[in-house]
């Protein structure tokens, strides 16, 4: 059995197939109100007592006399077994009465019951009844439809009871498209004022009348203004007044009128379609019929030759439908189209009705399509298909990736103070802090000038430069030790609460200027953004946009940083960046606070992060405590909470760090993240071996292994990172990553100030890559050309 959504969009390629049941937008009727106030089922007369009382519903249907010899109320004909047990308001019985009314109108408008449009409406009504019917009623649904056809023929031929069916139609469109003229053509008499030179309708008014026994009420509205600088405000005011007017009594059908001869590929009413969608919601298009006026105008091509009428109409309708799809952000909708001509000189048939160039009499078709829309809308109200279908892009269903959140959570290490890096270096230097510096024990060296250096042999030059490099390393190590002693002494003085510990006010100094152009262009405004570092611990800088326009400011955001040591044990820092352009607005901020206790250097840390992701914001809270369990061992426990897209993700982790001597650092952690009914587990192990001259020379090699488990899948990742100096003036960085899914990458970065041959190797590699790419593109073009030639031949 098809679901409701399949029922709505199953037949979307024809004129009637676009009639899904109305949406749940407040613009449309409330189903309870519709049942109480606007139900179209005729009032049931007093039932005729039969000679023998029925025993059941099925036996009652079998012993009924011919329809021409009785007057049986519709409610009794379509009652189900549930109604016989006491329910008076059965929606299936009311739909049965609605079917009879629809079939009577089919005959009245001269349509055959075998008409494709009639068949599709009946099919949808039948399918809707099957969806809502209970198991005991399924057998009677088909029987009701057959009885409805027979009863409709009988009632329409006899005219008893009188048809009680009404239409309430809202008319929308620009000024001058023929809204009032179309209303007059439907009634066959002037009921609404028209004027060819000025707007004929300046206020909302209802025009009522009867067409073929159907009570029709048109809600005529003021025309929308053409596109201009002030039209949007005026059109919005008109639409808001219309929305207030139809709020109490919503229309059954919406007509959107436009001139067929004024539509081209440069359709200028897209902003109007967007405005209608914004005011009423996308659901208004679910029961909207596109009415094209001036449909009998002469059709000519670009060269003045006549074109096929059907293709002429189809092209223009495709344009309008395309922009409606863009306005509602949905391509499933296909609105039905009605072609209308109101000019007195239009061709007429013997009955005096307007005939279009394709031979169609548009007035009966107009009424019949409005009836189909009304019937499907009433079925939706009676069966209470609410929130079953919607137009536009679905609501954001983006969910965060638990493995990604867990990976970020495990890597994130909370700050424990402003001098966190300095503390780690001090621990390494304290081991040999009291020893005499090796630099002071070195013999003096004579620095050679350029002329003397050139006279040395190649081996002597190498020995001389190596000696200078060695002395430079020892000198830098001596400076680090002196800095470490200074910080240690300041800490001792601070702990003794001496007055000399007050920090001196730092003088404001200008920061280095941002990179400017090579030329001295006076129009370049970089001088307006010079940054100053003052003693207030706030740093404000613009964010540079590398893709900016020439002679433009080139900055599209602002960056703010601050860090403060509130007291001896409390440290706080905050970083924020805001960027905005015409397409998006991005924000990133990080806030950290750390409190340190002297007991085993225990540190409590808290971090709050905010980051934009598309149209959503990601909030992240993380807290943890770090405790030095042994002299060279530190344990860290942390918890985290992340909010994204209205969902929350909670995680926890345990991390342990061990220092082995001066050069080996081992780190292991494990954690878990939960959210949205899912769980991700992971952990990592890292071993870092530092160089002999660390931290003066940042030479080290690191081995990492991470494991993530999610939905019974395990992903292992192996990594190798190394930085070393194979020779003086040459640095090499290697980064290798691989996983158990046979995926990975290798990055090698080489930097040298002496070996210029490396630049030639890089240039040759890039040249070969460009040549290979051009050959690939030429091969693809040749293959495409061969395929085209083969198809043509």
UniProtKB/Swiss-Prot annotation:
User: Which residues does the annotated region (G3) include?
Assistant: 220-223
* Chief location: plastid
Q: What is its EC number?
A: 3.6.5.-
Report the co-factor binding details: Binds 1 Mg(2+) ion by subunit.
Record region (G4)? 293-296
Region described as Disordered: spans on this chain: 22-59
GO biological processes: protein targeting to chloroplast; protein transport
Q: What sort of enzyme, by top EC class, is this?
A: hydrolase
As annotated in Swiss-Prot or TrEMBL, what is the tissue specificity of this protein?
A: Expressed in seedlings, leaves, flowers, and roots.
Give all residue intervals belonging to the AIG1-type G domain: 164-394
- What ranges does the record give for the region G1, renumbered to this chain? 173-180
Region feature (G2): 199-203
User: Which UniProt keywords are present, listed alphabetically?
Assistant: Chloroplast, Coiled coil, Cytoplasm, GTP-binding, Hydrolase, Magnesium, Membrane, Metal-binding, Nucleotide-binding, Plastid, Plastid outer membrane, Protein transport, Receptor, Transmembrane, Transmembrane helix, Transport
Compartments, record wording: Plastid, Chloroplast outer membrane; Cytoplasm
Mode of membrane association: Single-pass membrane protein
Q: Does the keyword Magnesium apply?
A: yes
Q: Where is the composition biased (Basic and acidic residues)?
A: 27-37
Instruction: Tell me which stretches of the chain form a coiled coil.
Output: 130-157, 410-442, 477-503
Q: Which cofactor does it need?
A: Mg(2+)
Q: Which residues are recorded as binding Mg(2+)? A: 180
Question: What's the family?
Answer: Belongs to the TRAFAC class TrmE-Era-EngA-EngB-Septin-like GTPase superfamily. AIG1/Toc34/Toc159-like paraseptin GTPase family. TOC159 subfamily.
What does the protein in this record do?
A: GTPase involved in protein precursor import into chloroplasts. Seems to recognize chloroplast-destined precursor proteins and regulate their presentation to the translocation channel through GTP hydrolysis. Probably specialized in the import of nuclear encoded photosynthetic preproteins from the cytoplasm to the chloroplast.
- Name-wise, this protein is Translocase of chloroplast 90, chloroplastic
Gene that this polypeptide is encoded by: TOC90
């Amino acid at each position: 059995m098809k679901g409701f959504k399949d029922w709505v969009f199953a037949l979307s390629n024809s004129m009637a197939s676009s009639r899904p049941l109305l949406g749940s937008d407040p613009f449309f009727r409330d189903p309870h109100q519709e049942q109480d106030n606007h139900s179209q089922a005729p009032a049931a007369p007093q039932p005729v007592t039969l000679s023998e009382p029925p025993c059941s519903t099925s036996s009652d249907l079998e012993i009924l006399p011919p329809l021409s010899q009785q007057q049986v109320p519709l409610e009794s004909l379509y009652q189900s077994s549930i109604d016989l047990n006491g329910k008076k308001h059965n929606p299936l019985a009311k739909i049965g009465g609605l079917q009879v009314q629809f079939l009577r109108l089919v005959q009245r408008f001269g349509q055959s019951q075998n008409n494709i449009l009639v068949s599709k409406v009946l099919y949808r009504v039948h399918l809707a009844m099957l969806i809502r019917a209970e198991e005991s009623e399924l057998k009677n649904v088909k029987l009701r439809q057959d009885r409805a056809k027979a009863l409709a023929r009988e009632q329409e031929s006899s005219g008893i009871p009188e048809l009680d069916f009404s239409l309430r139609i809202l008319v929308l469109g620009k000024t001058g498209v023929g809204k009032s003229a179309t209303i007059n053509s439907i009634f066959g008499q002037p009921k609404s004022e028209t004027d060819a030179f000025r707007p004929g309708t300046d206020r909302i008014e209802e025009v009522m009348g009867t067409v073929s026994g159907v009570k029709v009420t048109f809600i005529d509205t003021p025309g929308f203004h053409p596109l201009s600088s002030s039209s949007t405000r005026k059109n919005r005011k008109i639409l808001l007044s219309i929305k207030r007017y139809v709020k109490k009594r919503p229309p059954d059908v919406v007509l959107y009128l436009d001139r067929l001869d004024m539509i081209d590929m440069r359709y200028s009413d897209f902003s109007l379609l967007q405005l209608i969608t914004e005011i009423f919601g996308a659901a208004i298009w679910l029961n909207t019929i596109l009415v094209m006026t001036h449909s009998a105008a002469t059709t000519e091509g670009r060269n003045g030759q006549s074109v096929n009428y059907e293709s002429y109409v189809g092209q223009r309708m495709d344009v309008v439908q395309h922009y409606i799809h863009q306005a509602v952000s949905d391509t499933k909708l296909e609105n039905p189209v009605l072609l209308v001509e109101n000019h007195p000189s239009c061709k007429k048939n013997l009955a005096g009705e307007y005939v279009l160039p394709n031979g169609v009499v548009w007035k009966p078709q107009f009424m019949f399509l409005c009836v189909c829309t009304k019937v499907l809308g009433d079925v939706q109200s009676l069966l209470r298909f609410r929130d079953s279908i919607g137009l536009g892009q679905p609501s954001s269903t983006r969910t965060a990736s638990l493995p990604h959140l867990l990976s970020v959570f495990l890597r994130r290490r909370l700050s424990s103070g402003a001098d966190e890096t300095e503390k780690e270096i001090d621990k390494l230097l304290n081991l040999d802090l009291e020893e005499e510096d090796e630099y002071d024990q070195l013999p003096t060296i004579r620095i050679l000038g350029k002329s003397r250096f050139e006279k040395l042999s190649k081996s002597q030059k190498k020995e001389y430069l190596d000696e200078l490099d060695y002395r430079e390393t020892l000198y830098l190590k001596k400076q680090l030790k002196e800095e470490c002693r200074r910080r240690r002494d300041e800490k001792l003085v601070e702990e003794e609460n001496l007055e000399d510990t007050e920090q001196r006010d730092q003088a404001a100094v200008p920061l280095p200027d941002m990179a400017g152009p090579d030329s001295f262009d006076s129009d370049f405004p970089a001088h307006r953004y010079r940054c100053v570092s003052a003693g207030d611990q706030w740093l404000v800088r613009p964010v540079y946009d590398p893709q900016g326009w020439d002679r433009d400011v080139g900055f599209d955001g602002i960056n703010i940083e601050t860090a403060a040591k509130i007291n001896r044990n409390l440290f706080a820092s905050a970083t924020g960046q805001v960027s905005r352009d015409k397409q998006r607005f991005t924000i990133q901020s990080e806030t950290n606070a750390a409190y340190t206790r002297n007991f085993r250097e225990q540190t409590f840390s808290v971090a709050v992060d905010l980051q934009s992701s598309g149209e959503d914001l990601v909030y992240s809270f993380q807290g943890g405590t770090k405790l030095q369990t042994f002299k060279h061992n530190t344990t860290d426990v942390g918890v985290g909470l992340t909010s994204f897209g209205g969902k929350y993700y909670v995680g926890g982790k345990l991390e342990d760090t061990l220092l082995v001597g001066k050069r080996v650092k081992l780190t292991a952690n494990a954690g878990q993240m939960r959210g949205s009914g899912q769980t991700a587990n992971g952990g990592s192990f890292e071993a870092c071996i530092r160089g002999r001259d660390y931290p003066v020379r940042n030479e080290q090699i690191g081995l990492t292994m991470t494991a993530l488990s999610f939905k019974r899948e395990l992903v292992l990742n192996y990594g190798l990172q190394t930085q070393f100096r194979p020779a003086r003036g040459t640095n090499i960085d290697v980064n290798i990553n691989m996983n158990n899914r046979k995926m990975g990458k290798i990055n090698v970065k080489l930097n040298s100030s002496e070996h210029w041959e490396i630049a030639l190797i890089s240039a040759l590699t890039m040249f070969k890559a460009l040549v290979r790419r051009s050959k690939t593109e030429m091969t693809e073009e040749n293959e495409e050309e061969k395929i085209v030639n083969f198809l043509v031949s």
